[in-house]
């Protein structure tokens, strides 16, 4: 981690309802490429005396001309609250969520089975065959 990178937080808010702290993050990195999110998470963890696994940063945009990037960050009180409140795609980026993948053939067969029935019966057919 380089010392020429400065991280500032503003619009800091403690959201007690969702057990998290949320803020706008400003990263100053003059003459350097955009700082990786992992590095930002580590620096925020030091600033707020917590672990990087409960910190979620996203939505970073580098300003024209470079040197300044702004984004959004959330620090959860625990990992359980994060798993409960964060969207699945953000959890997947941290390796906390794995989407079960059905094969293409299974998806097509299910779709074609559902085409044969109408109304509320679709839910029964979509759930799978009864044995």
Curated annotation (Swiss-Prot):
GO terms for cellular component: cytoplasm; nucleolus; ribosomal subunit; small-subunit processome. Keywords: Acetylation, Cytoplasm, Isopeptide bond, Nucleus, Phosphoprotein, Ribonucleoprotein, Ribosomal protein, Ubl conjugation. GO terms for biological process: ribosomal small subunit biogenesis; translation. Residues 101-119 have a biased composition (Basic residues). Its main location: cytoplasm. The keyword Acetylation applies. Component of the small ribosomal subunit. The ribosome is a large ribonucleoprotein complex responsible for the synthesis of proteins in the cell. Required for processing of pre-rRNA and maturation of 40S ribosomal subunits. Part of the small subunit (SSU) processome, first precursor of the small eukaryotic ribosomal subunit. This is Small ribosomal subunit protein eS24. It comes from Macaca fascicularis (Crab-eating macaque). The gene is RPS24.
